[in-house]
Amino acid sequence: MNVARFLVEKHTLHVIIDFILSKVSNQQSNLAQHQRVYTGEKPYKCNEWGKALSGKSSLFYHQAIHGVGKLCKCNDCHKVFSNATTIANHWRIHNEDRSYKCNKCGKIFRHRSYLAVYQRTHTGEKPYKYHDCGKVFSQASSYAKHRRIHTGEKPHKCDDCGKVLTSRSHLIRHQRIHTGQKSYKCLKCGKVFSLWALHAEHQKIHF
């Protein structure tokens, strides 16, 4: 391939990627960090190790690694975490712009997509329709879960006994059989249950 042509095509690809990211991401900081991939700029430096990084989030995650096995503390809200992964996930709360507001009730979301899904609770819109039975859903995840009823697909497998289930929520509920976890407590008598259905059935004795 001609070198000049290759460079032009590579540059064009970068321009396209930048354009897509500018449309998908409403955070200028994300785009700026992405562009540093090409410039090689690393303006954020770890004071402990001297490592230079291209973005604030990368620096934060790197610094959190120093705290593995210790208590990692968030510099913004002083909340503490036990490991690097959880503190890095938490930090996104501070790093993302909560700028999407529902014009019906005022509830605020960090992502436009979350707002769009939430607004369907007001509009009643259900854009996902299953062709075999005609049932409609407001969320893609609910549609996918229902589809498995028809297809028989069970992608979630229990590591303890090998049982396969249609959804992650069903898997979590099933795993309580093995762990003995009982998350549902009766406020009247203090009795605890592993399943909501058992908890709900128990409640009837108090009424």
From Swiss-Prot:
The keyword Transcription regulation applies. The keyword Oxidoreductase does not apply. GO terms for biological process: regulation of transcription by RNA polymerase II. One of its GO terms (cellular component) is nucleus. Gene3D superfamilies: Classic Zinc Finger. SUPFAM superfamilies: beta-beta-alpha zinc fingers. Its main location: nucleus. It is found in: Nucleus. It comes from the Eukaryota. One of its GO terms (molecular function) is RNA polymerase II cis-regulatory region sequence-specific DNA binding. This is Putative zinc finger protein 137. Keywords: DNA-binding, Metal-binding, Nucleus, Repeat, Transcription, Transcription regulation, Zinc, Zinc-finger. Belongs to the krueppel C2H2-type zinc-finger protein family. A zinc finger (C2H2-type) spans 72-94, 100-122, 128-150, 156-178, 184-206. It comes from Homo sapiens. May be involved in transcriptional regulation.
